Amino acid sequence: MSGSQTLVVKLGTSVLTGGSRRLNRAHIVELVRQCAQQHAKGHRIVIVTFGAIAAGREHLGYPELPATIASKQLLAAVGQSRLIQLWEQLFSIYGIHIGQMLLTRADLEDRERFLNARDTMNALLDNRIVPVINENDAVATAEIKVGDNDNLSALAAILASADKLLLLTDQAGLYTADPRNNPEAELIREVHGIDDVLRGMAGDSVSGLGTGGMATKLQAADVACRAGIDVVIAAGSQVGVIADVIDGTPVGTRFHSLETPLENRKRWIFGAPPAGEITVDDGAVFAIMERGSSLLPKGIRSVKGDFSRGEVIRIRNLNGRDLAHGVSRYNSDALRMLAGHHSQQISEILGYEYGPVAVHRDDMIVS
């Protein structure tokens, strides 16, 4: 593909360590070399790196990964500076400056903070600086749980208005079955839409060092593809993998983006981590899915979590299936009071009103 491209490369702990308990510096050196090669050709490279906990564990000599959040945050605090120092040293060999962006998912929940992060990303890229994005594991808690690494990578790709997102992992891509247990498993080369059948094929990482599995990579691919970003899942050990993705050479599993991507605001809605969730009845499901309607309080059965007006929430049916993400017009306490009631009763129940709908269709993305 001709012309400059923006590529986000996500490097999980299993890739950075090679499955061991220590950072695999030789492997990291090779990945930096590949990134520098593409940077020299005029492409814009963004690194999303994890492994702060692994780096801290190596430095302090912890034989086992601790179970408590506080202990993991201790390791992250020690390892974060060592990890970014390593990236800086390696990129400086090629005369490339890096800029660290420490994020938590909370930084992306708020629309204004999201835009500020996007402006910072663009400023770095415009000045030929490679953004190196880390989770702020030393202060965050949700980020240490399974799945956030891959989903944060998709959000980083949205921030960068990337052309492609490369998720490097310890497998060659998405298989029809777990290749570790099934010798007949086949690599899926092309994906044009993520459905339940595809999700059923996803297995989990067994490295014990990272927090992401193949299922969460599918979630990240879904978010990025809806935003108009192609996604490739490939092995971090694949020779020349970064050049292959830039050039369009078949490698790993490629997820094709939507031909009509979401507009910028809806990219944020779909990508933002939900602050809570609501369960709706079958009537509301029909109205949302078949009629393209807004969600009214009458259709709400239950509310989970504590969230404010204007935050993104998840909408689910009675079976727990995700239907949509949307911006709530009311806070969680208000929606609990309004659940099952007609819109005409809102003022009577609350003493105020922000309109007749709980989530407006214009502020909703159907899954």
UniProtKB/Swiss-Prot annotation:
GO terms for molecular function: ATP binding; glutamate 5-kinase activity; RNA binding. It comes from the Bacteria. GO terms for biological process: L-proline biosynthetic process. It is found in: Cytoplasm. Its EC number is 2.7.2.11. It catalyses: L-glutamate + ATP = L-glutamyl 5-phosphate + ADP. One of its GO terms (cellular component) is cytosol. Pathway: Amino-acid biosynthesis; L-proline biosynthesis; L-glutamate 5-semialdehyde from L-glutamate: step 1/2. Substrate binds at D137, N149. SUPFAM superfamilies: Carbamate kinase-like, PUA domain-like. Residues 275-353 form the PUA domain. InterPro entries: AceGlu_kinase-like_sf, Asp/Glu/Uridylate_kinase, G5K_ProB, Glu/AcGlu_kinase, Glu_5kinase, Glu_5kinase/COase_Synthase, Glutamate_5-kinase_CS, PUA. SMART domains: PUA (SM00359). ATP binds at K10, T169, D170, T211, G212, G213, M214, A215, T216, K217. Keywords: Amino-acid biosynthesis, ATP-binding, Cytoplasm, Kinase, Nucleotide-binding, Proline biosynthesis, Transferase. Catalyzes the transfer of a phosphate group to glutamate to form L-glutamate 5-phosphate. Belongs to the glutamate 5-kinase family. This is Glutamate 5-kinase. It comes from Yersinia pestis bv. Antiqua (strain Antiqua).
